[in-house]
């Protein structure tokens, strides 16, 4: 953990409307686009009744730039108008991390 550098996590939690036509395609497009953004570190995502996507960034500026990226702005608008019945966004600073892996 000697070389650990704190980073930021954007936690996007949501519930969807009944009509999700086009959602999966847009989610794939946004993940592909996010991976090209300066400061992007990674992403984890899961969806059942409630969906949670956590994206990781090296700075608050990188998060701000992603939020204001033109195609992402269009996706946000479509999400509010068509796909989501509710969502919540949290931005957190990750000071420490660790993991367990039984296969190692």
Q: Residues of each region from the PLM?
A:
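Short S/T/G/P-rich N-terminal loop/turn motif that feeds into the first structured element of a domain
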Residues: 1-51, 60-68, 84-104
């Amino acid at each position: 953990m000697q070389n650990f550098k704190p980073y930021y996590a954007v936690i996007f939690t949501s519930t969807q409307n009944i009509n999700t036509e086009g959602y999966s395609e847009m989610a794939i497009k946004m993940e592909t686009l996010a991976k090209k953004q300066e400061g992007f570190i990674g992403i984890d995502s899961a969806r059942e009744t409630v969906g949670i996507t956590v994206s990781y960034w090296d700075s608050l500026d990188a998060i701000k730039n992603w939020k204001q990226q033109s195609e992402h702005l269009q996706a946000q608008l479509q999400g509010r108008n068509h796909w989501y019945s509710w969502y919540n966004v949290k931005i957190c600073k990750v000071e420490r991390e660790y993991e367990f892996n039984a296969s190692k």
